[in-house]
Amino acid sequence: MEALARIHAPAKAQFIRGIALELERLANHVGDLGALAGDVGYLPTASFCGRIRGDYLNMSALLCGNRFGRDLTRVGGVRFDIDGPVKESLLTRLEAAERDTASAVNLLWDSSSVMSRFEDAGRISEEVAREIGLVGPAARASGLGRDVRTDFPKGAYRYSHVPMCTWSTGDVFARAYVRWLEIQNSIRFIREELQELPEGALHVSVPALMPESIVVSLVEGWRGEICHVAITDESGKFHRYKVVDPSFHNWSGLALALRGQEISDFPLCNKSFNLSYAGFDL
């Protein structure tokens, strides 16, 4: 809508949006790693990550009063500011969560029984990943460099670069390990954004939308590329609106990853993609 209205959110709003997006990524990546640990019966990491995921969700609640970040953004900017006390609280919580996350997740890589289940399970080659159009961590775990934050940087990602994390083996381990690498990058990004948070307005006014126009918007969600397409009619009202979730692109990847696998490997492969039924049907 901002593109259709020919406006840009203020710099401070863009920073806050970036922080919120990476907090969402942190909560879900940590939750996924905990679930993968649970699927192989490794309860220490499964239990720790369940609690740590809540820590990241509570940071989102500190931003806007909702653990899932609802009502934070608005057309033209954001609804909530990050003042001094909130900033200091976020930095303190982030440091504690970073330490706890590292302790919990590194247990996985140090466990031979976990690694024997993760490695070589559900392989997707880079060639296949490219042919079927995988996106997000699933694509990057197969060595396919594809990330909206790098390929089409917008908002806060124009000011602060997030390194793209890839792995080459394309198995359950790779999809788990890419999440761990991205967790570390997201924490560094949030810390940098908080320390360099600019002053200024939180939002701008929104004029009428351009008539008879089409806009394509891309965001790198925690599952991968999210695409919104909007078309307006002659009066500037929506004529068509379509959302494409990462699950739409990645479901065939899960199907291919399961070929030739043991039945006991299904939960691992399934959770390593962690797709959305509702997202696929959008």
Positions of predicted regions on the chain:
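Active-site bordering "gate/hinge" segments
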Residues: 1-282
